[in-house]
Amino acid sequence: TVNLAPADLPKESGRFDLPIALGILAASGQINPEKLAQYEFAGELALSGLLRPVRGALAMAWQGMQAGRSFVLPQENAEQAAVMRGIAVYGARSLGEVAAHLNGIEPLTQTECKLPQRPSEQSKIPDLADVKGQHTARLALEIAAAGGHSLLMMGPPGTGKSMLSQRLPGILPPLTEDELVEVWALRSLLPNHQQQLDSNRPFRSPHHSASSAAMVGGGSDPRPGEISLAHHGVLFLDELPEFDRKVLEVLREPLENGEIHISRAARQAVYPAKFQLVAAMNPCPCGYLGHPSKPCRCTPESIVRYRSKISGPLLDRIDLTIEVPSLSAAELMQQEAGESSAAVLERVTAARKIQYGRQGKVNAELSVSELDGKARIQKEAQEALGTMLEKLSLSARSFHRIMRVARTLA
């Protein structure tokens, strides 16, 4: 009899094949049962006895490390699981190799993984030098990168909003070791779990037709969605008002707390979702409101309806909102390249180093109490800010957003 306890916890995937087979071998006296207590096992078995890769290897390695056990799993998963420090990882090709290891006949070799020291294929990330003009938008992008701030760009079609957003990863520092482990633990839960390790920050750009489940994750067996896959990276939402309003509203919790709670009938899951939101939109349905040469064809009612798709509470959580105007013919024809991503990255890295030295986090993550303690402002600035808050009827959250951005600028 094979018993998978606890019975009330739903089981899925073939990762239990190897533990079940080893239990049978131990019960029949073919391996030493006492050896099993030292290890965690996971792997799908083929009819030939070969081990097939499973998803969730890095997440399982984290649990094994917490339990103080070594981890035996398919060879294809071993390098990924070995990213977790503090646990011995052994990769095996077959059930026979695992049995020989446990019996001391032919020990498995411990897998060591060298963490990537620099982003792989950095040259494939588009360079900011390709962007012509748009000096204000480039500055806003640099400020957002330096402080981890969310950013909304509004402007007519073809002004470079998407182009700028796609270049944000190129001016963000590479993942730290702890961040890399978190990012890859989430990726290991997906079916395409055999991707090559790299330290590039995630960049997710879901289509505006994406459902709530695709955005936050879910299903009968909860899996991370787009916002969790953008953890420690960038979530880019192009054509923001075209997203379903319910989809946009689910962003409010992770933008505030950095995690998402998923509840299903069978189980509940909590996934990290500390991402940097970058969004782009047109000023109106036709896209040409305020364009210097193309007239807008929209009625005032349609413009109001279009913009009302984005709720006030969501807009209140976006730190920076800028207009990206259309370029003149002279700006489009200029031959001189703009400042490169590498040059901007140096300034962003220096700014982040100061922030981590002061407070251990970027300014966008400062709590209200931390702002009150660390971001004191002069009396004259306090009076000017108070006047602006009253004149524009800004909320308390808006006040704190202004303080965070001001601290980054300083």
Segments the model singles out, each with a brief description of its role:
Residues 1-152, 156-159, 263:
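Peripheral, non-AAA+ core regions of ATP-driven protein-machinery
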Residues 3-12, 222, 245-410:
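Basic, amphipathic alpha-helical bundle interface domains used for macromolecular binding and assembly
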Residues 44, 153, 168, 237, ...:
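Hydrophobic anchor at the beta1->P-loop junction of P-loop NTPases
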Residues 47, 235-236, 242-243, 329:
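Residues immediately C-terminal
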Residues 106-143, 147, 175-227:
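P-loop NTPase nucleotide-binding/switch module
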Residues 152-195, 257:
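Walker A/P-loop
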Residues 232, 238-240, 250:
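Walker B catalytic acidic pair
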